[in-house]
Every structure is written in structure tokens, then in C-alpha cells.
Amino acid sequence: MKKKSVWIKADEGGWEQQKERITTGLESGADCVLVNPGDVGKVRELGNIPVATFGRDNKSGAEIIVVGKRGEGDGTKPLPLETQGSLDINAATLLRDKEVAVGGYVIIKDKRYEQFAAEMGKVCDFLIVTGTDWKVIPLENLIAELQRYDVKIIFGVKNAEEARLAFKTLETGADGVLLNSGNIQEIKDTIQAAREMENERTELESAVITRVEPLGMGDRVCVDTCNLMQKGEGMLIGSQASGMFLVNSESDDSPYVAARPFRVNAGAVHSYIKIGDKTRYLSELRTGDAVTIIDSKGRQREGFVGRVKIESRPLMLIEAKAGNRTLSAILQNAETIKLVGKDGNPISVAKLKKGDEVLVRLEEGARHFGKKIEETIIEK
């Protein structure tokens, strides 16, 4: 679930015109706005969003300084014959040496500008490139050229359709887009396109329940999110990183308690939770942490922790078999705690029995500090 960012370009025209773009971006979840130095303070008054600005120093207070406007990058000044003689590259290098986040801005007019952009990207945190009448080929080349460098490629687009194309180029696509549009709907659609690209599907399969055994008292973790979940949506939880159960949110009413669709009563404190392509311990989660919400079709989206509650409750051991692999989870022993069945319908652990089929996620390889590694490991 690689994050795709959307920057809003708001450096041309009057402030009132740009203000509408910025406000829409803020309300829709844009990741950054690119403005002129004199407008940085005005953006701060509108809301809390990272700001990038054009310049060669960090006096504006913006989080990111972008080099290239009115320079070599946009064609105002001629390209140098040698990289060492580039005013833009030298300015970007000086900023980065001062530990300032720096972006390079290049309008790709021909092959020479593409080559210049590649060199600029090697000294920047962000490389912002826009095309003239050609798009996919230079972006492919830049992604391939810079894949070994710690730089995020932001591609200039005018609408959501161009953004989707940029996100899908090669296997990785652009890291983000810089949207230059005053159309309110295009801003919303482009941000939505970015979120859709992040929400790749997770492959789920069914496992057969082989053991359901009540345990004694233990500490379990309840994750209250800032998001409302539907039937069949929840989180992947397990005692082994190699296999996790889809634990349903408390999105259904019960005879005992009203629905709390923001909650996943997730499991014992030792349990793993899958977040993106990593795992964490449930007991590590804190307010504001990102989590991955997954439904029975494997569709995933990002959520955020609003509150974590660790309380002593009666526990239940659940084991299941998928092929020749055994996986387990320890959940609270209560009617409201549910796994997701093979058909997508929740099954209460209070009614779970041997032979029932539930949805799980299987992983290959071991984990080290939550990251997948190639290593032999046995978890029981």
C-alpha cells in the first residue's frame, strides 16, 4: 500500500483564485501545496498542510524549498553544458547540505531537459517534472534512472485522468502528482484517484477451524479508530506473522450492546496486526497511528487510531488450518467478537466450531522488527 501524494499547484494568479484551490485541497486531503514565498503565511492561516515554495533559501518557513522556477529548470536560463556548472543543481545541493527538504522543478521540453531532470533528482528529496506534449516516455525513463536514489518523483498533471496514468507508469509509477487545475471537481477526483491507487487488494483465503478453546483471563487490546467500518470489514490479527485472521469490526448490533462500527476488538496484547506491508504488536498502537482496514474481498484502506484500550478479559484460543499450515489467534471470549466467514459474513467466536471456514491472510518469510525478511523461522 504505497502512498501516492497529491500536491496542489497554486503559484499563479491572484490570491483569491489560488485560495479556492488550496481550501479544496485541504478539505479533500491533499498532501502539499506549492505556492510563492509570499503566500506561505496565508496558507498557514487556512489550515495545517505541508507547504512547498519556490526559492533558493529557507527564509519563507515552508517545509520544502523548490529550485528551478525562473532558472534552468523551467527554461528561463539555458541549460549548462556540464552538470557541475548548473546553478539549480548547486543551489539544491547547498540547501540539502543544510538539511533543508528540497525539490527540483523541471519542465521537460526535450531529451536534454530529461537528462537534466535525472541529474537534478540525484541531489533532491523531490523531483517535480512537467511535460509539454509528451508524458509517459520521460516519466518511465526517470523512474528507471532514479530508482536507486532516495527521491520522490512528482509528475505535473492537469486532471485526474493524467494522474491515474502517472500512478500506473511502470510497476511503481510516480510517487505523486502536482495538479495544476482550478476545477474543484478535478481536485477532488485527483485526490480520490490517489487513494484508490493506494488501496491495493490483499489476497485472502479460507482456513478451516480446528480448535476453539476457552482460556483464562488475560489482557486484550481494543482498537477504536477514527473511521466507520462496514459488515465484513476489520483488521488482520494473529499470533503468528505468517498467518492472520480477519477480525470483524463491531459493526453489527447485538442483543447485548449497540454497534460500534469504529471498533475492532482485536486480540491479546502479544498479537500481531498487519499494517500495510508490515506488522506491529497490538500493544504498541497509540492514538494517531495508521492502521489498515480490510474487507472480505481484500480491499484495503487506511484508518487512524483514535484510542487504544487494554483491559483484562476472558480469552479464547482459536486455531485453523490452511493447506498444511496452522495459524492461531487469541481473542476475547465474547459474543460481539467475530471473525469473517468464507462467505463474507461475520461469525461470533461464541458460536465458532470445528469445521467452520474463515478468511485469513497467509505470508511467506519471517519478520524482523515488522519487516518481511528471507529467513527460516518457526512460530508455534
Swiss-Prot record:
It holds the Pfam family DHQS. One of its GO terms (biological process) is amino acid biosynthetic process. InterPro entries: DHQ_synth (IPR002812). Keywords: Amino-acid biosynthesis, Aromatic amino acid biosynthesis, NAD, Oxidoreductase. The keyword Oxidoreductase applies. One of its GO terms (molecular function) is 3-dehydroquinate synthase activity. Its EC number is 1.4.1.24. It comes from the Archaea. It is an enzyme of class 1 (oxidoreductase). It catalyses: 2-amino-2,3,7-trideoxy-D-lyxo-hept-6-ulosonate + NAD(+) + H2O = 3-dehydroquinate + NH4(+) + NADH + H(+). NCBIfam families: PRK02290.1-4. Belongs to the archaeal-type DHQ synthase family. Catalyzes the oxidative deamination and cyclization of 2-amino-3,7-dideoxy-D-threo-hept-6-ulosonic acid (ADH) to yield 3-dehydroquinate (DHQ), which is fed into the canonical shikimic pathway of aromatic amino acid biosynthesis. This is 3-dehydroquinate synthase. It comes from Methanosarcina barkeri (strain Fusaro / DSM 804). The lineage of its organism: Archaea, Methanobacteriati, Methanobacteriota, Stenosarchaea group, Methanomicrobia. The gene is aroB'.
